[in-house]
Swiss-Prot record:
Family: Belongs to the NrdR family.
Name of this protein: Transcriptional repressor NrdR
Cofactor section: Zn(2+)
HAMAP family associated with the record: NrdR
Taxonomic placement: Bacteria, Thermotogati, Thermotogota, Thermotogae, Petrotogales
Any one of the GO BP annotations: negative regulation of DNA-templated transcription
UniProt source species: Petrotoga mobilis (strain DSM 10674 / SJ95)
Length: 150
């Protein structure tokens, strides 16, 4: 694996452990040239799932897009990147197990909200505000009431 700091081609693995219900492996590596340390994740390649958007368009599932949406909701919140990775890994595992080659974007949004609810309520409301397309203060207040009552 190429070092992201100096570009040297050889690294050694310092630590390797399964993560996310055993669906991926986290490896801690060290560059043999500059001794910089970095983390990599290895996961098996999944079948291509298509997302059905609200307007009916279809596009290929993009892990980065899902990660970025969750990262934005969790910005400046006490939610680690590892927790966000775990959310995405859990959702991907559910998608794989469903056996469906297509899924509605609303189902993925519901899965994200379900997981964020137990991790960080502010991130949950932030994500919901974009996903549910809140247009006014009443929409926010309704989401907060529902969160408090659950």
């Amino acid at each position: 694996m190429k070092c992201p700091f100096c570009g040297y081609e050889e690294t050694k693995v310092l630590d390797s452990r399964p993560v996310s219900n055993g669906t991926s492996i986290r490896r801690r590596r060290e560059c043999l040239q500059c001794q910089a340390r970095f983390t990599t994740y290895e996961r098996y390649e999944q079948t291509r799932i298509r997302i059905i958007k609200k307007d009916g368009r279809r596009e290929l599932y993009d892990r980065k897009k899902l990660m970025n949406g969750i990262l934005k909701a969790c910005e400046k919140r006490p939610v680690s990147t590892d927790q966000i990775e775990e959310i995405v890994d859990n959702i991907e595992e559910q998608l794989r197990r469903s056996g469906n080659s297509e899924i509605y974007s609303s189902e993925i949004g519901d899965k994200v909200m379900e997981q964020l609810k137990s991790i960080d309520q502010v991130a949950y409301v932030r994500f919901a505000s974009v996903y549910k397309e809140f247009r006014d203060l009443d929409s926010f207040l309704q989401a907060i009431r529902e969160l408090k009552n659950s």
